[in-house]
């Protein structure tokens, strides 16, 4: 049973992805391999809300929106939605946009997602939704039903479904090199 309303967001994300922790050892898809590499390199579950939002913002802005496969397949209205999401993430982190306003935007974008017929557009919109989680929802989700890994790792699956192995590898490279993740690097002895 869902312990809190915010858990439903994570459950929706997980619906479209495999249960990576159970299958990671036996699956050799590029998204699972990338997820395994990420969790072997960083303490993903230690990532805080602010850092996750910065990473999500930078991914949408610098990787997702610059990918050629996006511009060939995604309508301009969704590109604008992604750009708007980037602005809203930063406004929320600087306390200009309230958590309530971010929550309203998340509901609006979920409605767009649910009305889309194209799975390609739905995958793209689902990646955008990752940036529209407010801090209270993030905290509730972690306290009641998920880990940061449960939130972050399905992104690899959505990236893989959207543009294949090439973008999946770019996403991993982006994460491994992101300055925010340095402090979460696992020191292997």
Stretches with model-predicted labels:
Residues 2-189:
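Structured binding/interaction patches within domain cores
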């Amino acid at each position: 049973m869902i312990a809190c309303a915010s858990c439903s967001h994570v459950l929706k994300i997980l619906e479209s992805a495999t249960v990576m922790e159970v299958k990671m050892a036996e699956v050799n898809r590029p998204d699972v391999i990338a997820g395994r590499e990420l969790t072997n390199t960083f303490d993903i579950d230690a990532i805080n809300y602010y850092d996750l939002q910065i990473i999500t913002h930078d991914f949408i802005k610098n990787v997702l929106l610059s990918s050629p496969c996006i511009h060939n397949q995604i309508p301009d209205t969704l590109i604008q939605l992604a750009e708007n999401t980037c602005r809203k993430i930063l406004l929320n982190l600087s306390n200009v946009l309230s958590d309530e306003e971010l929550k309203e935007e998340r509901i609006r974008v979920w409605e767009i997602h649910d009305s889309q017929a194209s799975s390609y557009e739905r995958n793209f919109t689902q990646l955008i939704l990752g940036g529209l989680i407010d801090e209270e929802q993030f905290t509730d989700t972690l306290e009641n039903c998920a880990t940061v890994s449960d939130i972050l790792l399905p992104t690899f699956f959505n990236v893989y479904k959207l543009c294949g192995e090439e973008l999946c590898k770019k996403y991993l490279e982006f994460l491994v090199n992101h300055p925010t993740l340095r402090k979460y690097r696992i020191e292997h002895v």
